[in-house]
Regions:
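Short glycine-/aliphatic-rich beta-strand segments at the starts of folded cytosolic domains
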Residues: 1-21
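Short acidic amphipathic segments
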Residues: 29-50, 54
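Charge-rich, low-aromatic oligomerization/scaffolding segments with amphipathic character
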Residues: 57-74
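Ser/Thr-Pro-rich, acidic low-complexity intrinsically disordered regions of eukaryotic RNA-binding
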Residues: 22-29
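C-terminal low-complexity, charged extensions that often adopt amphipathic alpha-helices
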Residues: 3-4, 72-103
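Short beta-strand-to-loop capping motifs
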Residues: 17-19, 53-57
Length: 103
């Protein structure tokens, strides 16, 4: 899987990935993250092409092992799965409330 490093520090890396990070893909990533305890957090950006990984200091190689561990066929299936709704954030609630008031 070809990824592009956009930013990196001692315990965080932001990558551009070749798959869309939909809600179903996010759930799949969280499930697979359990096998890599040194990865502490996965953050998917709203543009669905960038992902940030937070990891324990000195374990940046575990991020690349994690990405190699992911199955491409499963990722493709999850990208097409629109039955899983994204988590509702407080901003989404406020925006929908304002929209209903205006309409």
């Amino acid at each position: 899987m070809k990824v592009t490093i956009k930013a990196q520090s001692k315990n965080r890396v932001r990558l551009e990935v070749p798959f869309r990070c939909t809600a179903a893909v996010q759930l799949y990533l969280e499930e697979e993250k359990r096998l890599f305890p040194e990865i502490t957090q996965i953050i998917c950006y709203k543009d669905e092409k960038h992902i940030a990984f937070t990891f324990e200091t000195g374990h940046e190689s575990s991020v690349y092992r994690f990405l190699d561990h992911l199955e491409v066929t499963t990722l493709n299936e999850k990208q097409r799965d629109f039955t899983v709704d994204a988590q509702v954030t407080p901003v989404d609630i406020v925006v929908s409330h304002i929209y209903r008031k205006l309409v």
